[in-house]
Amino acid sequence: MTNKYDHLDRQTLIGLLQRRDAERQLGLVWERDEIEADQALNDDFVALSLDAGLSHGEAPWENLIIEGDNYDALRALRMTHKGAIRCIYIDPPYNTGNKDFVYNDRFVDKTHRFRHSLWLEFMYRRLQLAKELLADDGVIFVSIDDNEIFRLGMLMDRVFGSDRKLACLTWQTDGNFDNQAKIKIAHEYVLAYAKNPEIFPMPAMVDPNVPSTSKLFRSEIRNTIVKNGPKNPVSEIFLPAGFPASFNEGIVHKRNDERWPKIERDICVLNGCLESGVVVRSGWANKDLCQKFIAGGFENIKDSKGQDTRFEITSTGAIENVKVRSASHVISVLRNMGSTQADSSLLVDMDIQFTYPKPVNLIQYLISIASDDKATVLDFFAGSGTTAHAVAKLNAEDGGNRKFILVSSTEATEDTPDKNLCRDVCAERMRRVLGGYTNTKGQSVEGLDGGFAYLRTRRIPKHRLALKLDHAEVWHALQLLHSRPLSHWPSGGFASDGELAYLADFQAAHVEQLYEWLRTCTAGGASVYTWSTERLNGLLGETAAGVSLLPLPHYLRERFGH
């Protein structure tokens, strides 16, 4: 059997080995040159084709379920959603060797020589695309177990940068205590990386295991600024008239005993303020900040962490800084977030067969950490559709308008060519979650409302776009590019949506529709896509002033990239 090195002489081979040894560094290395190429990799354009029959609810649709290889879907989304996704959650195949990782339509088993390299290459290609989709303040969560946690961590560092890591969360699972392992595993991991950690907002969440009586739920944080020690020598602060008090009316008594701070005389408080100025003596923390507060006329100021801060004197004479508490207390151990067993039972009640789904509560919590109530949430290993279920549940609870994008392959293999996980599990679950259903016990379960468009990826050679790309695919790509919900292509030659229009041909009736639409548009705000901008510009004449005329398929090809 020949290989690519057979024709090389001894000295050339030695040179190759020396260069390889010199390049090897501490870190993640996988056999990219030796493994079987991923058949999903291609340079074709990827169109998204709507299947209205498998969609749910009435158009227009804000949520998307995409059937196809996620490498293709991610490239299509890079064209339409680059920099627009606030939160990504994925639960990729765990690569245990137990028929959980499909590569080139075949399961990769434990005996495969390059099992880990195949998995790393597969993930690397997709994570690179995912990074481009994240908004500047976006975050990605990746579930993983012990089999690949260390390799995945190094891979995430390579793709996103080690300085972008927010946390390695540990999710306490129910575990499998029936097996004979010496140590029973009762946890998995969730790696969290931010596009830009410095602008990732403080999570507006308190761990659900914190009791409601905890001080974490108080609206303010109060701490005395008295601090005596070698680094905080005794000094004076003058509190002028008008300095705030923590009570409305009364007397703060002179303090000249062992207590700090020392107060030279009794002070009267009226209407929540000192009636006259007084000198107080102590060692201080935040003395400079307190004096800035005084100099600023007792208006709230920002501390070093950007928190609103004010200062008050209490009835006992203590000086306190008072900070507005943000409801944020996220810890790295995730407990009581549901279980795969409970959510498996939920799917059984829906009459949907799927093993080991992630708990809705877990993903709901992660989304709450990472996004606001208008965020778009992406899952490109959608499985049973738990991420979309979590989004719908959150919206129902807080009235939010989050949107989901799910990507799932059919998971058909050589042995199961008719399998379609996306259609029969993922989309079917969401039809029932949103529309309501009767469970296997005969009980009626109310829907959470909402709908989704069901799309399929379709590869088209870039040089054949003008011939192979149909008008509906163009229209849907343009709607997504302009952050519009998807609607049906009207089967004519013209469609418009807000300030967006697509002229598919130059029939007189369709050009007239364009004229009518332009009369309703804001000056300078209209974008018209056409297959011949030169011809359209000639037809419109002065009407084209202030209108953006964009050429097809060139514009889509350029946005799609490589």
List the model feature ranges, each with a label.
Residues 108-111, 118, 141, 149-198:
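Accessory substrate-recognition/RNA-binding modules or partner subunits associated with SAM-dependent
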Residues 1-89, 95-125, 279-285, 296-303, ...:
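DnaQ-like (DEDDh/DEDDy) 3′-5′ exonuclease domain used for proofreading
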Residues 177-241, 461-476:
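Flexible, glycine-/basic-rich loop-and-beta segments that form/coincide
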Residues 210-349, 358-376, 382-384:
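Segments forming glycine/polar-rich beta-alpha architectures that bind adenosine-containing cofactors
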Residues 393, 397-562:
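PRPP-dependent phosphoribosyltransferase catalytic core
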Residues 116-169, 422-439:
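Conserved Class I SAM-dependent methyltransferase catalytic core
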Residues 30, 37, 113-120, 147-149, ...:
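Conserved S-adenosyl-L-methionine
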Residues 83-102, 156, 377-392:
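Conserved proline-anchored active-site loop of SAM-dependent methyltransferases
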